[in-house]
Amino acid sequence: MEGNDLDKYRFPKTLSEQNRIIGLPLDEAIPAAVVLLWGFFTKKYLFSLIIAAVIWQLIRAAKCGKSSRWLYNWCYWYLPTELFRVVYRVIPDSSFRKWIK
């Protein structure tokens, strides 16, 4: 492969490398950022900062050192499927727990 061909691909330094925002994984950063933005627009800066920190700690405690994929899988199996229809148009309902071949 030449230099131009390699530019098409992304090679992570480690296998566990994942996208991060300010050092936080996306599943921890996005809920906290939403709360911070809400607090910014409603001018409740300190309240939103405290709530964002609490949400961040709750997500970290729920994960218990597991990966982000574990949290996504837990949400798929235990939360209503309608929550995922926004992102995933074709996703089977989690109540159908048997694989169909």
UniProtKB/Swiss-Prot annotation:
Matching InterPro entries: Pilus_assmbly_TraL, T4SS_TraL
Keywords: Cell outer membrane, Conjugation, Membrane, Plasmid
Any one of the GO CC terms: cell outer membrane
Top-rank lineage group of the source organism: Bacteria
Record-level GO BP terms: pilus assembly
Compartment list: Cell outer membrane
Cystine pairs: none
Membrane topology reported for the UniProt record: Peripheral membrane protein
Function: Membrane protein involved in F pilin formation.
Cited NCBIfam families: TraL_TIGR
Protein name in the entry: Protein TraL
